[in-house]
Structures are given as structure tokens and as C-alpha cells.
Amino acid sequence: HQYAGYSGGRKTVAVGAAGEALIAHTHGPAFIDHPGTRLGRIAGNPFHEAITEAAWRVRLRFILNIVLDDDKRILRVAAGEPDMAFNELVNFARSVYEVPIPHQYDIAIGGVGYPKDSNLYQASRAPSYLFFAPTPVVRPGGFFIIPARCEEGAGVGAGEQRFFNAMSQAADVQSSLEDARRNGYPPGQQRAFVMAKVLEQTQVIIVGSECPDLVTASKMIPAKTMAEALELAAQ
């Protein structure tokens, strides 16, 4: 879970078995705006601290978690007391999945792969994950280029429709952020807030989408080919 630093452990309880009120609280603007809420960050991460407390309050006593590779093969298993097992796997996962970023880049190309590239809600995870790294991968004013067909449009679920409505109905990115900070939002719509934060500092190009008008309505840039996307980013 990107907000928690690493998934697993306490997340089995919260967010896994949490009610909507707790999910709305932990996914709200105050948590997502906090500079400690970053991928791979545990220390000083308020989201991690909140769901760890939730797991403690319901007396989570035992977990069995795994670390997978890109082909879903098991690399490491840990079981036992939640904090000890979780921390063991986090330390191992860091050696597998974390890559030092020597500096910020003008352009980053990345995708989420099938089946997540089938709708814009899921495809937008790629730029947000890179943006919410401890050091954002792309400099302010730079570009994320994301290949995604988005044949399902924004997505058909309630959260996916809330995401699209929030993105498309806002006059601009800044007003979307201001409205969310002032009024909050229901679960699922946090992705619109996350993407507004991304788009406040960078631009996102979606390549090969079957719904280019939907991409434009969501404050992102459609491109037919990777060559076109690179040309747009180079202008």
C-alpha cells in the first residue's frame, strides 16, 4: 500500500478489514498531504502509524506474510509477532525492490501492466507511485509517460467513477486540491486528490488510450504513440 510505506502486516486489519470511516480518515487530505506519507517510508509515516495502532487495538497477534517477485513467486516468508515479522520482510523487500535515485529526471516512462492498464483509475497508479517516492522521480515541470489502453474508460466501480467525476468536474487541478482540503471526499475519490497533487507539479501523458477524450477530461494528455508522447514532452 503506497501510503503505508510497505503493505502487509498491520494492513491486514486496516485497511483490509476496516470500516469505511477508518478508511476515509486514513486516506484523507491530512494524511496524503503529510511529507512522511511516501512509498517505502516507515519511520515518520503517519499512515503507517495510524494503521499500526488500529491493528494493536484489535489485538492482532500473529501474521504470516510473504514477499513476491515480479512473476508472483515467493522469495521470503515470515510468520509470528506482527511487528517482528513485518519488519523482517520490509528489510528484505528493500534489498529487492528499492533502487537509489541519484537525481530527479525530466521524463519517466512506466506502466502498471495488464490488467491494471485497462482503466484510467488503475493506470494512474504508475505516475503517483513514482511521484510519492521518498524523492519524486520526476522534477517539477517534468513528464510521466504511461502506456495504457484504458479500454474500460475510467473504470466501472464506485470509487473509479468518483475519481473520474472529481477529476473531470474540477475547473483545474488547483481548485480540485482546494476543494478536497476544504470538504474532504468519500473513499475511492482519494485517487483524484493524489493525481491532482501529481499534476500540480508535473504533467502526465497517457499513450495508446482508447478513450483520449476521457484522458483530456481528467487533466492528463493523450498521445497515440510513444514517439508522439516523447515529442510532446520535449517541446
Where are these regions (language model features)?
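Conserved, well-structured core segments that form the ligand-binding/active-site neighborhood
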Residues: H1-Q104, P136
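Short glycine-/acidic-enriched loop or helix-start segments at secondary-structure transitions
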Residues: Y3-S7, N119-L120, G155-G157, T216
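N-terminal glycine-/serine-/threonine-rich phosphate-binding loop
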Residues: R94, Q104, S124-R125, E228
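Structural motif
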Residues: D106-G111, I145
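C-terminal non-catalytic interaction/assembly regions of soluble proteins
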Residues: P127-Q235
